Swiss-Prot record:
Superkingdom field: Eukaryota
Signal sequence segment: none
InterPro entries membership: Cornichon
GO biological process, one term: vesicle-mediated transport
GO cellular component labels: membrane
Name listed for the protein in its UniProt record: Protein cornichon homolog 4
Membrane-crossing segments per the record: 8-28, 53-73, 113-133
Family that this chain belongs to: Belongs to the cornichon family.
Pfam families recorded: Cornichon
Higher taxonomy: Eukaryota, Viridiplantae, Streptophyta, Embryophyta, Tracheophyta
Membrane topology listed for this record: Multi-pass membrane protein
Keywords, in A-Z order: Membrane, Transmembrane, Transmembrane helix
Length: 137
């Protein structure tokens, strides 16, 4: 029964990450179609970057503490990428450069979204597997 709770908690962490990344993509799309000015778009995106990094870090530590080594190893590249961006001070969107880097910023977030959705599908699979395994016992 404990594994189901572990997968359920990680499911909600991943849903939060998907929501944050989709919010960033919507802000970039609004900027692309001129619904929002660059300053507002950059401030909205920058306000959720650190929570995204924190949620991802907590999720990776959560997998480590619960003994799910495969999922921990699967989360490490994304965590390393976030740490690399943060240490080089490239994690925030610059207001003056946002139009020049718009396609790159969208592409980065689409790759992040695909990576998180893959983790989400694996989490759903293991949650269902754990529920069926507990049902058989």
């Amino acid at each position: 029964m404990g594994d189901i709770w572990t997968w359920l908690i990680s499911f909600f962490f991943l849903i939060a990450l998907v929501g944050i990344i989709v919010y960033q993509l919507v802000c970039l799309a609004d900027l692309e179609f001129d619904y929002i000015n660059p300053y507002d778009s950059a401030s909205r995106i920058n306000s959720v970057v650190l929570p995204e990094f924190i949620v991802q870090g907590v999720l990776c530590v959560f997998y480590l503490l619960t003994g799910h080594w495969f999922m921990t190893l699967l989360c490490l590249p994304y965590l390393y990428y976030n740490f690399h961006l943060y240490s080089k001070r490239q994690h925030l969107v610059d207001v003056t450069e946002i139009f020049n880097l718009l396609n790159w910023e969208k592409k980065k977030r689409l790759f992040k979204l695909a990576y998180i959705v893959l983790n989400l599908f694996l989490t759903i699979f293991w949650m269902i597997y754990s529920a069926l395994d507990d049902y058989e016992d």
